[in-house]
Every structure is written in C-alpha cells, then in structure tokens.
C-alpha cells in the first residue's frame, strides 16, 4: 500500500502528503461508511525535472478510475454504483452543475438535457500501470507496475468522442 512509512521517494511528494497506514485504514472506513463525498484528481503531470525540484503531485488522470476500482470496488469496500457517484454525480452536485439551469450545462446524470460527458469502461479488464504509455507529459506515477482491474476504453465530452483533435480544441 502507498503510505508515508513505505515511500520516501522525492518523486512521490504530494499535497496532501502521504499518511500512515493507520490513516489509510481510516480513509477506507470513511469510504465504506459514506463519510467521503468525492474522489477526484488534480492531475499534476510534472516532468522528472519538476519532481526533482520538489514539485508536488503526479499524473492521476489515466489511473484514477482503475486504482479506485481495484482498491475500493474489487476489495468490497464500496459498490461500483457508489464509485460512480463519488467520481461523477457527487462532484457535479457539490459544484452546482447537476441542474439544467447551470450556466455551464448540467452534468453528473444520464438524463435528457444533461451534457453527454461519459466514459466507457471495461470493468473486468486487467492491466498493469505503465506510465511510459501515458498520453500526458508527466510520466511520474506511484502506481507504476501496479496490477489493476477496470480500463477506461473511451471518453465523450459534450457528446463528442474524445480524440487528440477534440482535446486540442478544448485546450484553446
């Protein structure tokens, strides 16, 4: 498990910092009892040089679902429905984006009038985290070589399947 006692590597400096295994167990309990409302990532894709200079964070976008699914759903801590809420519906609700009057368009539900921001996931695909295959600039990942279950196969943003061209347009 990733915690402060086992990982003193400069590349793994994060905010908030890694905690003890006791804290990690308490966090699992908080997922289980409903205390935790959201799972998200700030996706801080730093280069190796950035990390060597002490930049906190690491790439999380390409592993967040699979790691959460493996560590929380596959182990029975929470259901897949709860994970979906933690990563989609709950953040939208907390940010006020879950209604059709939202100035940015409604999100977080599969309903008419809501933006079609979706992912297609194979919940059974087993794979090994290999940061060299990440599309992001940051190849630093504490989950390197971790065996995970659950693979995001495709993403749609506002109803359009995500492609490199769409990503370039969104960034502008």
Where are these regions (language model features)?
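C-terminal cap of metal-dependent C-N hydrolases
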Residues: 56, 112-171
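A short acidic, glycine-rich active-site loop
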Residues: 12-22, 59, 141-147
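His/Asp/Glu-enriched, well-ordered alpha-helical/loop segment
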Residues: 11, 32-33, 37-39, 44-119
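Short glycine/proline- and charge-enriched loop/turn segments
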Residues: 5-13, 49-52, 135-139
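Short C-terminal domain-edge/linker segments immediately following a structured domain
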Residues: 20-29, 69-74, 148-155
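Helix N-cap and loop-to-helix transition residues
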Residues: 1-2, 20, 47, 79, ...
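A generic local structural motif
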Residues: 23-27, 105-108, 141
């Amino acid at each position: 498990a990733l915690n402060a006692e086992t990982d003193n590597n400069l590349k793994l400096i994060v905010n908030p910092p890694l905690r003890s295994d006791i804290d990690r167990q308490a966090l699992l309990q908080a997922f289980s009892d409903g205390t935790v409302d959201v799972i998200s990532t700030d996706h801080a894709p730093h280069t190796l040089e950035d990390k060597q200079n002490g930049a906190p964070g690491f790439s999380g976008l390409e592993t967040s679902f699979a790691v959460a699914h493996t560590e929380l759903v596959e182990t029975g801590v929470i259901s897949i429905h709860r994970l979906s809420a933690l990563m989609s519906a709950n953040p939208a609700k907390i940010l006020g984006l879950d209604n059709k009057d939202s100035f940015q368009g409604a999100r977080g539900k599969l309903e008419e009038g809501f933006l079609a921001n979706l992912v297609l996931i194979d919940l059974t695909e087993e794979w090994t985290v290999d940061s060299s295959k990440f599309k992001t600039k940051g190849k630093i990942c504490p989950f390197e070589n971790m065996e995970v279950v659950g693979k995001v196969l495709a993403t749609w943003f506002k109803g359009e399947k995500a492609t490199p061209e769409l990503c370039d347009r969104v960034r502008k």
